UniProtKB/Swiss-Prot annotation:
EC number: 3.1.-.-
NCBIfam families linked to this entry: fen_arch (TIGR03674)
Positions of Mg(2+) 2 binding: 174, 176, 235
Protein name: Flap endonuclease 1
SUPFAM superfamilies named among the record's database cross-references: 5' to 3' exonuclease, C-terminal subdomain, PIN domain-like
Species per Swiss-Prot/TrEMBL record: Methanospirillum hungatei JF-1 (strain ATCC 27890 / DSM 864 / NBRC 100397 / JF-1)
Its biological purpose: Structure-specific nuclease with 5'-flap endonuclease and 5'-3' exonuclease activities involved in DNA replication and repair. During DNA replication, cleaves the 5'-overhanging flap structure that is generated by displacement synthesis when DNA polymerase encounters the 5'-end of a downstream Okazaki fragment. Binds the unpaired 3'-DNA end and kinks the DNA to facilitate 5' cleavage specificity. Cleaves one nucleotide into the double-stranded DNA from the junction in flap DNA, leaving a nick for ligation. Also involved in the base excision repair (BER) pathway.
Lineage: Archaea, Methanobacteriati, Methanobacteriota, Stenosarchaea group, Methanomicrobia
Pfam families given in the database record: XPG_I, XPG_N
Keywords associated with the record: DNA damage, DNA repair, DNA replication, Endonuclease, Exonuclease, Hydrolase, Magnesium, Metal-binding, Nuclease
Length: 333
């Protein structure tokens, strides 16, 4: 997912302070769901499921993680992708192929008793289908949280909402959110905490990247950042072998973009990709007014339909309700 800009952004990421996270968070819903589905699994990689065999890992992630957001003063808005641009067809097919191959390797690792390998391949086999999307949306709305339907890429819509002043930052793992122009990108918010990586426990912290700091430190424009991404590869075009982010930065600053494209990718027109990042389809058709949490509806959905323990769900609902009452009292002063 996203673009390979990490090597030139490593020194520009910093831990996000608690106060910096308060406010409206425009969450890339597909990205968050993918993280929940990838990580919330049993030791052999099997996702959480209800008695009917329906996956519930994403519901667990949405409910418990979002409840934590609300108690910290974070107001989540979930943005769902719309129609993918035709340019993304290659990437979508490649991801489908990776999932199918990973599924086969996951099954084999389980047969061999290789739990570490099974978990790793299971993560790579993660897929988001119609059930995942509809059940996620239902729970989000039962929690009284706004849902925005993007006409195309969710990160682009989130960036637009931050630029417009309707949100404070975009939450996504994908660096291409910066290419869409978001002033602030927060990574790791949906997966922060202790996580298992390559067989060992690590602590993942939310990190904050400010676009203006990136551009000023690297001494480039947003258009040049997009050109670096095009050279290294995006969801909409393959990269050039041998050119990573650091090399791409050098090439762009020396004015070599056009000549490299002509030499290495003579049949590729970068303009549609550049234009999509600069002027993506977005919409003003949304409302961010929060609704009230439907406690009975959540119990019926999580505990009744999907087998969640009411002993785990009720304390979380109480915590959210307490925060809601506190906010109501504060609004009088």
């Amino acid at each position: 997912m996203g673009v390979a800009l990490r090597d030139i952004l490593t020194d520009l990421k910093r831990p996000a302070e608690t106060d910096e996270l308060k406010g409206v968070a425009a969450i890339d819903a597909f990205n968050a769901l993918y993280q929940f589905l990838s990580i919330i699994r049993q030791p052999d990689g099997t996702p959480l499921m209800d008695d009917s065999g329906r996956i519930t890992s994403h519901l667990s992630g949405i409910f418990f993680r979002t409840a934590n957001f609300l108690t910290q003063g974070i107001r989540p808005v979930f943005i769902f992708d719309g129609k993918s641009p035709e340019m993304k067809g290659r990437t979508i097919q490649e991801r489908r192929d990776v999932r199918e191959e990973s599924k086969e390797k996951w099954d084999q690792a389980k047969k061999e008793g290789d739990l570490a390998g099974a978990f790793r391949y299971a993560m790579s086999s993660t897929a988001i289908d119609a059930y995942i999307l509809s059940s996620a949306r239902q729970l989000i709305q039962l929690m009284g949280l706004p849902v925005v339907d993007a006409p195309s890429e969710g990160e682009a819509q989130g960036a637009y909402m931050v630029l417009k002043g309707d949100a404070d930052y975009v939450v996504s793992q994908d660096y291409d959110t910066l290419l869409f122009g978001t002033p602030v990108l927060v990574r790791n918010l949906t997966i922060s905490g202790k996580r298992r990586l390559h067989g060992r426990q690590i602590t993942v912290q939310p990190e904050r990247i400010v676009l203006s700091d990136v551009l000023s430190t690297l001494d480039i424009t947003r258009e040049q950042l997009i050109e670096i991404a095009i050279l290294t590869g995006t969801d909409f075009n393959p990269g050039i072998r041998g050119i990573g982010a650091k090399t791409g930065l050098k090439k762009i600053k020396s004015g070599e973009f056009d000549s490299i494209i002509r030499e290495k990718l003579p049949d590729f027109d970068p303009e549609p990709v550049r234009s999509f990042f600069l002027n993506p389809p977005v919409t003003d058709s949304y409302t961010l007014d929060p609704g009230r949490i439907d406690r009975d509806g959540i119990r019926a959905f999580l505990c009744g339909e999907h087998g969640f323990s009411q002993d785990r769900v009720d304390p979380v609902l109480d915590k959210i309700s307490k925060k809601e009452k506190q906010k109501t009292l504060e609004s009088w002063f």
